[in-house]
Amino acid sequence: MIMATITLKGNSIHTAGELPAVGSQLPAFTLVKSDLSEVSPADFAGKKLVLNIFPSLDTAVCAASVRRFNKEAGERGDAVVLCISADLPFAQGRFCTTEGLDNVVPLSVYRSPEFGLDYGLTITDGPLKGLLSRAVIVTDASGKVLYAEQVPEIVQEPDYDKALAALA
């Protein structure tokens, strides 16, 4: 099985699978919105996407990434930002409502454990085993991957500048 090695506070942990390659088509998925409806990439057809993927909104770095992408999406308006985690849809909805974040679409993988494997992001060992690692994937309007970053240290934020530059 293909694995990536990343770190959590300097300690090595692993993920199963492989991050989608730049130039490939975004793998299919079915994820759950905060109203419990299901969505897939087809629901965003014709739009550029930023997939902001992370372990849980209940961590400072994950919450910071959602706030930052919400701000950037509001200023740009040229892409849909999907914030994807294993948090339950209720918690995601509450977080976004409380924080006033209305420029991102929170999505839960709780019904779709295969998402993490298909995207190479399921953590397979260590204290966060079973959650998703931190990554950002950017696609064009046809679903072609333009940028993919699996953040090498989970407690670090993604490279926002590179991700947003891929939208240009």
Swiss-Prot record:
Active site: C62
Keyword Disulfide bond: yes
InterPro entries in the cross-refs: Redoxin, Thioredoxin-like_sf, Thioredoxin_domain, TPX, Tpx_CS, Tpx_Peroxidase_subfamily
GO molecular function term, any single one: thioredoxin peroxidase activity
Catalytic reactions on record: a hydroperoxide + [thioredoxin]-dithiol = an alcohol + [thioredoxin]-disulfide + H2O
Record EC number: 1.11.1.24
Occurrences of domain Thioredoxin (ranges): 20-168
Cysteine-cysteine disulfides: C62-C96
Keywords: Antioxidant, Disulfide bond, Oxidoreductase, Peroxidase, Redox-active center
Highest taxon above the source species: Bacteria
Oligomer and partners: Homodimer.
Family under the similarity heading: Belongs to the peroxiredoxin family. Tpx subfamily.
Record NCBIfam families: PRK00522.1 (NF001808)
Note: The active site is a conserved redox-active cysteine residue, the peroxidatic cysteine (C(P)), which makes the nucleophilic attack on the peroxide substrate. The peroxide oxidizes the C(P)-SH to cysteine sulfenic acid (C(P)-SOH), which then reacts with another cysteine residue, the resolving cysteine (C(R)), to form a disulfide bridge. The disulfide is subsequently reduced by an appropriate electron donor to complete the catalytic cycle. In this atypical 2-Cys peroxiredoxin, C(R) is present in the same subunit to form an intramolecular disulfide.
Main function: Thiol-specific peroxidase that catalyzes the reduction of hydrogen peroxide and organic hydroperoxides to water and alcohols, respectively. Plays a role in cell protection against oxidative stress by detoxifying peroxides.
HAMAP family named in the record: Tpx
Protein name: Thiol peroxidase
